[in-house]
Regions:
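N-terminal carbohydrate-binding accessory modules
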Residues: 1-60, 147-151, 169-177
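Arginine residue identity/basic-tract feature
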Residues: 6, 50, 55, 66, ...
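General structural signal for secondary-structure boundaries
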Residues: 40-44, 107, 162
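Aromatic-lined substrate-binding rim segments of carbohydrate-active enzymes
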Residues: 41-103, 143-157
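Amphipathic alpha-helical segments in well-structured domains
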Residues: 83, 111-115, 142
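Active-site region of glycoside hydrolase catalytic domains
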Residues: 92-95, 116-177
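Short glycine/proline-centered loop/turn elements that form peptide/ligand docking sites
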Residues: 101-107, 135-138
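Active-site-adjacent "subsite" loops/lids of carbohydrate-active enzymes
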Residues: 104-120
């Protein structure tokens, strides 16, 4: 299922395509998706309900490489399914998400592959605006990350506070500034 873009990046800022309104990227609400490891769909939905009053707000959903990829090219499909349920849940409440990969110091290519696999599992989640670029990536690795993701997910916007480029949106996470 291919989703249409709901947001776009212009000069380092995020805008809603429907209204043209600038989105607030200065205080994303943090959520550690690691709590979804090994949980049922019901538990994932209960986690989403915590954000039922956050219509229009954006969550920074931290996705650990090690949570998504158990070992090389072996993915935790139960975790990814729970992540999808969570993201579909916040979608029903009108909240949005930016997936923030946590690299755990791993190889950039494996991290990119794991996040591409993650994106495939959450591809029908309209709540997902895009992905943040891990600070650990070099400029060329960041470009490779975006290229790999864009092959199948051209609607995503990319976020970074370290990497340069007018197509990248800067952001801050509430409580972590």
């Amino acid at each position: 299922m291919k989703l249409d873009a709901r947001f776009e990046s212009k000069n380092g800022k995020l805008y809603a395509l429907k209204t043209g309104e600038k989105a607030d990227t200065g205080a994303f609400i943090p959520f550690d998706s690691g709590v979804l490891s090994g949980v049922s769909s019901e538990s994932a939905e209960a986690e989403a309900q915590r954000f039922s009053q956050d219509r229009g707000k954006i969550l920074a959903v931290y996705v650990s490489h090690r949570a998504a990829e158990i070992s090389e090219n072996t993915y935790d499909e139960m975790y990814l399914a729970a992540l999808r349920v969570f993201l579909k849940g916040i979608e029903t409440y009108g909240a949005y998400a930016v997936a923030v990969p946590l690299s755990d110091g791993d190889d950039a290519e494996r991290l990119t592959q794991a996040m591409c696999h993650t994106a495939r599992r959450i591809k029908d989640c309209a709540s997902v605006i895009g992905f943040a670029l891990p600070d650990s990536l070099t400029e060329s690795e960041a470009a490779a990350f975006i290229d790999a993701m864009s092959e199948k997910h051209s609607h995503y916007v990319y976020f970074s506070n370290r990497h340069t480029g007018t197509a990248l949106v800067t952001y801050a996470v509430a409580g972590l500034r």
